[in-house]
């Protein structure tokens, strides 16, 4: 767990945007998820979801940078909300709202904020961690395995 938290400092969070503006609050939320207390971890994950995948679609550029940390947290047995993390990763993997909107409204592609590309980058980030998901299929927790299977299925498309 310490290794993942050390890597947080290598991400330029101040330069990235989430749904609230600057993504500087994301490292604290990720660290809080590792607290071991289920209620605290779930509350932090809910707040993180609102910042990176609100309403089920990728909201800003910080999502892709957050995905590797979520994948690592999902592997740690001491993290109490691993199922919810996998569900969030599936939402990110399935996100195509900006891409679909750009088909109908191509001017969206000319905006300074490149939501379509941020969404694609986030999906690629989830796909890059397929091996992590496969490793969870052998876990004893049936709910975790089901969430991992659903995510693996979404990545198989």
Where are these regions (language model features)?
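N-terminal "cap/leader" segments of large eukaryotic alpha-helical scaffolds
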Residues: 1-41
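HEAT-repeat alpha-solenoid elements in large eukaryotic scaffold proteins
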Residues: 1-8, 38-51, 86-89, 100-110
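Flexible loop/turn segments at the boundaries of HEAT repeats in alpha-solenoid HEAT proteins
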Residues: 14-19, 55-63, 96-104, 112-123
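Core helices of alpha-solenoid repeat scaffolds
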Residues: 22-27, 59-67, 125-130
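Buried hydrophobic core positions in alpha-solenoid tandem helical repeats
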Residues: 28-30, 69-71, 132-134
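Alpha-solenoid helical repeat architecture
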Residues: 33-37, 74-77, 137-138
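Residue-level signature of the C-terminal ends
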Residues: 51-55, 73, 92-95, 136, ...
């Amino acid at each position: 767990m310490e290794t993942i938290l050390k890597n947080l400092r290598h991400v330029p969070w101040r330069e990235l945007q989430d749904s609230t503006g600057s993504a500087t609050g994301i490292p604290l939320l990720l660290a809080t998820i590792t607290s071991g207390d289920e209620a605290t971890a779930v509350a932090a994950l809910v707040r993180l979801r609102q910042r990176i995948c609100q309403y089920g679609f990728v909201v800003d550029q910080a999502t892709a940078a957050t995905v590797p940390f979520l994948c690592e947290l999902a592997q740690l047995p001491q993290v109490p909300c691993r199922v919810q993390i996998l569900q969030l990763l599936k939402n990110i993997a399935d996100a195509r709202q900006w891409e679909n909107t750009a088909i109908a409204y191509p001017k969206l592609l000319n905006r300074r904020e490149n939501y379509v590309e941020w969404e694609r980058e986030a999906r690629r980030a989830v796909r890059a961690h397929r091996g992590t998901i496969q490793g969870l299929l052998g876990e004893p927790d049936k709910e975790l395995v089901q969430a991992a299977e659903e995510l693996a299925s979404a990545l198989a498309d």
